[in-house]
């Protein structure tokens, strides 16, 4: 039976280390869970797709040398795409790649929880894909609300993302649930 689920690893790249908000606080747990997800999906024959965010200048430029897999992760992707927008499905060729392979379900993971990962999950859902959003295999950083000045923790950001995606755009899944769900659905 052909594989109909693909893992999407979004922006797990060295570029982020050069942003002022970079923090190592949640990094070890993220790397462990992301690697477990990559390994589990690859072991089950799911295509693993790696997405890199690319900009013309700065740490996200190809010339910077930072558009490469985040240290600590080992990913052997079946396909790699460069994006310039928040959604991995916008302007990358990823949509055509998925459709041509009969992919119906996406497992979304990577960096940042509330930005490119959430945007990709919404876009994928609206495009007809089933989506498993593995929030424990996403990474973000504390953020300050511009108007109120309140600082939001990564746990609060993750919870908010789960709240707005669950049941509308995605199934919120753990690493194990996402891998097992693929085994059941395929």
List each language-model region with its residue ranges:
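Acidic/histidine-rich helix-loop elements
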Residues: 17-28, 148-151
């Amino acid at each position: 039976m052909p594989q109909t689920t693909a893992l999407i690893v979004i922006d797990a790249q060295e570029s982020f280390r050069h942003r002022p908000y970079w923090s190592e606080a949640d990094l070890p747990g993220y790397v462990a869970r992301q690697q477990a997800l990559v390994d589990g999906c690859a072991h089950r024959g799911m295509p693993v797709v790696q997405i890199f965010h690319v900009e013309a200048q700065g740490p996200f430029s190809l010339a910077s040398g930072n558009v490469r897999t985040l240290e600590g992760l080992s990913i052997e992707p079946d396909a790699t795409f460069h994006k310039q927008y928040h959604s991995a499905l916008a302007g990358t060729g990823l949509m055509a790649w998925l459709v041509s392979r009969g992919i119906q379900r996406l497992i979304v993971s990577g960096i940042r929880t509330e930005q490119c990962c959430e945007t990709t999950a919404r876009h994928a859902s609206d495009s007809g894909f089933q989506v498993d959003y593995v929030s424990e295999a996403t990474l973000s950083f504390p953020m300050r609300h511009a108007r109120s000045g309140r600082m939001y923790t990564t746990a609060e950001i993750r919870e908010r993302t789960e709240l707005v995606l669950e049941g509308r755009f995605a199934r919120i899944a753990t690493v194990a649930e996402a891998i097992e769900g693929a085994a059941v659905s395929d």
